From Swiss-Prot:
UniProt xrefs under InterPro entries: 4FE4S_WBL (IPR034768), Whib (IPR003482)
Record-given protein name: Transcriptional regulator WhiB
Recorded GO MF terms: 4 iron, 4 sulfur cluster binding; dinitrosyl-iron complex binding; DNA binding; metal ion binding; protein-disulfide reductase [NAD(P)H] activity
Induction (UniProt): Transcribed from 2 promoters; expression from the stronger promoter is induced when aerial hyphae became visible and then declines. Expressed during exponential growth but decreases during stationary phase in liquid culture.
Record family assignment: Belongs to the WhiB family.
Lineage top rank: taxon: Bacteria
Cofactor(s) needed for function: [4Fe-4S] cluster
Keywords assigned by UniProt, alphabetized: 4Fe-4S, Cytoplasm, Disulfide bond, DNA-binding, Iron, Iron-sulfur, Metal-binding, Sporulation, Transcription, Transcription regulation
GO biological process, one term: sporulation resulting in formation of a cellular spore
Organism: Streptomyces coelicolor (strain ATCC BAA-471 / A3(2) / M145)
Function: Acts as a transcriptional regulator. Probably redox-responsive. The apo- but not holo-form probably binds DNA. Complements a whiB2 disruption mutant in M.smegmatis (AC Q9S426).
Keyword Lyase: no
UniProt signal peptide: none
Amino acid sequence: MTELVQQLLVDDADEELGWQERALCAQTDPESFFPEKGGSTREAKKVCLACEVRSECLEYALANDERFGIWGGLSERERRRLKKAAV
């Protein structure tokens, strides 16, 4: 019984994060999604605009309080503003 419960938990976790396998950023240079301070985010955001899992990515970043990088097409500052506007 315990093995079954553990497998169900693993399956649920895999399903929740399955969108990451379909993310376009997984096929590109991760450095562009985590630019140095003052660096350009243009290329990363361009990739996000064409990505089919953009909304799942943004939801994940907001739910997990991701503080670095471009997630769902938004920078950390843009995500912070979005959270404030939602409250």
